[in-house]
Amino acid sequence: MEERVITRRDFLRGAAATAVAAAMGPGILGEAQAQPAAKVVLIRNADVLAQPDKMQGILESMLDEALKTLLGTSEPMEAWRKLVKSSDVVGVKSNEWPKLPTPKPLEGAIKRRLLDVGVVEQNISIADRGVLENPIFQKATALVNVRPLRTHHWAGIGSCLKNYIQYAPNRSSFHPEACAALGSIWKLPMVEGKTRLNIQCALTPQFYGRGANFFDTRYVWPYQGLIVGTDPVAVDTVAAHLLQVKRTAFFGEDRALDVPPSHIIVADKKYHLGVSDLNRIQLVKLGWMEDALI
């Protein structure tokens, strides 16, 4: 296991990240606190994509190890029980974008552990579109937020923050200013205070794209990882940093996206949803770390 704190200089390196800082003003460049204020776990497995029939089991183990480290427990189920009670009604907010959806084995791994905690199957729903009309999500007492990591035309990256846009009745109204108002969705009654876990699925992330609904396999790579945390802003900050470093490695520069992922910083500074300063995020790395990049 390796622990390190990513520096702000790492994150702000390159034109796109500099644009994020400029868009948000000088406040984010102030003196950082001495101690990390958020913890994020990156876990990778060299075999997770190699054997489709064993993928769910590997992902269950990856989630178990990540949560033990994240929450400081000796046993995985102890960690899961810190997040969810058997009496909870749980909505798993997934993402079904057809070109790069949340993998079914990952959804299955999450559901398996919810059942193991004692949540009854009738009180679990995995959904993306239609959550406003979904009876489980309507009465949910706990949410798990999971989505694939990719660039995004309107938001810079497909973030955990962005994944809740289906809770908004008028989704297109959140597109202006690089989706700056996404954090407000997390204040809605169906969402506020309910999210127990955020997972950026970095098994096969897309690190570059331009234009709406862009997808190109040239810009997808088998990273074979999960980025996990209870703080959605911190998880997204690490995820955005990973995509930035990959673009720099691939192109020889941090090639600009349609918009910088500035909504992540807004979610911190305006909506107070978490930590967007990399100098205040403790990143713990587990598992296979060849070409980890961060």
Functional labels for PLM-detected ranges:
Residues 1-294:
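N-terminal and secondary-structure boundary signal
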